[in-house]
Amino acid sequence: EWLTCPVGMIWDNKQCSGSAIKLKFDEVDQAILKANEQLKGKWRLPKRHELEKLVCMECDKAKIETSIFPNTPPESFWTSEINQWQPRFMWTVNFFTGHTFGRFPGYIPNYVRLVRDR
């Protein structure tokens, strides 16, 4: 189950409002704790293949179904995976290009979309 809004935004039964926030990788755990507390459940960062499944190459501005995930910034989102070829870098999925990149060190902030197992 996906969180409809990126971290920092709030679902108001019609759309995501507010501003999505970029987090450094070491700040993500705190956001997950807050989500678990406020929204109940066991939220987590998605694996690379999970986040890649949200990419919609036919979609316009943001490469994601905005009817399901409204107001998604067309930028990079963290996955939970380290780039095994370059262990200082994490994998991200870019919703502007629809591509996956393993070139972001954890100190560069990126957006976060959380998921939980049913």
Predicted regions and their residues:
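Extracellular adhesion/carbohydrate-recognition regions
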Residues: 1-43, 114-115
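Extracellular, disulfide-bonded carbohydrate-recognition/adhesion ectodomains
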Residues: 19-25, 98-113
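An exposed tryptophan-centered "aromatic clamp" motif
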Residues: 27-44, 48-97, 103, 117
